[in-house]
Amino acid sequence: QFLAGVCSRLSFRILSRSHWLMFYQERYVNMQDKSSAAAYASDEGTEEIVIPLRPHHGMCLAYFKGEGYSNGFTAHMAEMLKIFLEGKKIRLHVDTDEICSACPNNRGGHCEAGDKVAEYDNAVLKKCGLNAGQTLHFSEFTKKVQEKILAMDKRKEICGNCQWNSICEEQKSRWA
């Protein structure tokens, strides 16, 4: 499983965005675990790919500046940000997502900091008036995150104990 994850991340890095999206769809739509596959499927009745996103990552991406756990993680996060900004749809997902795939806390699809980040996710959902499993455009989501959390100075209430908090405090949100 570990080797499959490494190969998956290496495959991601050598694929162009359009090829990656096809790879992504095959990777998740063809999953054996249908409950997990449902989180990654195309939107109802369309061929448009809907990318799962942990709600708290809407805040992480607002302040992301190329720092992170490793060079591989930051390259992956930067590429995911580009993909999301192309107008993709997301499905709010309180579990590991594609950003998590390059994180050292991801162990076989489960986050070692699972309880803490699930609290972050649920707090973002609550403050934004959204629900787990909800599908929307990334831009709609970031607008809610900016208006309901970041502009209201509520970020620290949600994730002030995050190890990356100082990065967020140093700069302005890219969603502003």
Question: In which residue ranges do the predicted regions lie?
Answer:
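Local cysteine-cluster metal-coordination motifs and their immediate loop/turn environment
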Residues: 56-68, 97-113, 154-172
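Short cysteine/histidine-rich zinc-coordinating motifs and their immediately flanking basic loops
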Residues: 71-75, 112-117, 171-176
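Long, hydrophobic N-terminal alpha-helical segment
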Residues: 32-83
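Mid-chain, well-packed structural core segment of small domains
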Residues: 107-141
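Immediate flanking context of iron-sulfur cluster ligation sites
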Residues: 47-55, 87-104, 134-160
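Short hydrophobic targeting helices and cationic amphipathic motifs
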Residues: 3, 24-25
